[in-house]
């Protein structure tokens, strides 16, 4: 950064040295006419020399630079979109690898839970207790079985949940039908 500051400071000093006197100060006004005429001649000479310098270094048409910067902007925009596309593709493949790896982990976890359940079943001494635990699990009944075993009053509407209670009765989980009024 200090190199950039040195460069800018050098350019500033160079501009100050090359700048010609273009305005009259109060000191030149108070001088006699003879010295003013001499200074005017010197100033016109300086103007002629700066004009000669300007002619030796003519100003270029800035449209070339404008087109170059415009082309550079399009190249940078293209590169930015290219990097964005590569980044999204890399993220997608990383997610797919993570999902495939997680699927393998889930299979091993399922195997370990099955082994733990088998050990638990082996540890249970009383078979009657095991049978009682298995019977207390909720059972799921399809709608066809419910329609065959129960009266026509129990047919469910859309969105209603049928439950078989421990006493053997089949009924709806929610008896409140506030949505029917709407």
UniProtKB/Swiss-Prot annotation:
Glycans are attached at residues 42, 48. It is a single-pass type I membrane protein. The chain crosses the membrane at residues 65-85. GO terms for biological process: bile acid and bile salt transport; positive regulation of protein exit from endoplasmic reticulum; positive regulation of protein glycosylation; positive regulation of protein targeting to membrane; regulation of protein stability. Residues 1-20 form the signal peptide. Expressed in liver. It is found in: Cell membrane. Residues 86-182 are cytoplasmic. Residues 21-64 are extracellular. InterPro entries: OST-beta_subunit, OSTbeta. It comes from the Eukaryota. One of its GO terms (cellular component) is plasma membrane. Keywords: Cell membrane, Glycoprotein, Membrane, Signal, Transmembrane, Transmembrane helix, Transport. Essential component of the Ost-alpha/Ost-beta complex, a heterodimer that acts as the intestinal basolateral transporter responsible for bile acid export from enterocytes into portal blood. Efficiently transports the major species of bile acids. May modulate slc51a glycosylation, membrane trafficking and stability activities. Able to transport taurocholate, estrone sulfate, digoxin, and prostaglandin E(2), but not p-aminohippurate or S-dinitrophenyl glutathione. The transmembrane domain (TM) is the major site of interaction with slc51a. The extracellular-membrane interface is absolutely required for transport activity. The intracellular-membrane interface is necessary for establishing the correct membrane orientation that is essential for the heterodimer Ost-alpha/Ost-beta complex formation and transport activity at the cell membrane surface. Belongs to the OST-beta family. Interacts with slc51a. The Ost-alpha/Ost-beta complex is a heterodimer composed of alpha (slc51a) and beta (slc51b) subunit; may induce the transport of slc51a from the endoplasmic reticulum to the plasma membrane. This is Organic solute transporter subunit beta. It comes from Leucoraja erinaceus (Little skate).
């Amino acid at each position: 950064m200090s190199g950039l500051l040195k460069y800018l400071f050098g350019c500033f000093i160079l501009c100050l040295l090359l700048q010609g006197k273009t305005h009259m100060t109060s000191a030149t006004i108070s001088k006699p006419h003879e010295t003013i005429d001499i200074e005017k001649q010197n100033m016109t000479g300086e103007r002629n020399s700066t004009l000669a310098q300007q002619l030796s270094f003519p100003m270029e048409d800035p449209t070339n630079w404008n087109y170059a910067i415009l082309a550079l902007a399009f190249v940078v925009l293209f590169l930015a979109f290219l990097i964005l596309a590569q980044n999204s593709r890399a993220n997608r493949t990383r997610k797919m690898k993570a999902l495939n790896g997680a699927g393998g982990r889930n299979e091993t976890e399922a195997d370990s839970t099955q082994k733990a359940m088998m050990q638990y079943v082996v540890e249970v001494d009383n078979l009657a207790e095991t049978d009682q635990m298995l019977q207390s699990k909720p059972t799921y009944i399809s709608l066809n079985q419910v329609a065959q075993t129960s009266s026509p009053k129990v047919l469910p509407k859309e969105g209603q949940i049928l439950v078989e209670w421990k006493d053997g009765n089949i009924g709806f989980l929610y008896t409140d039908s506030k949505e029917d009024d709407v």
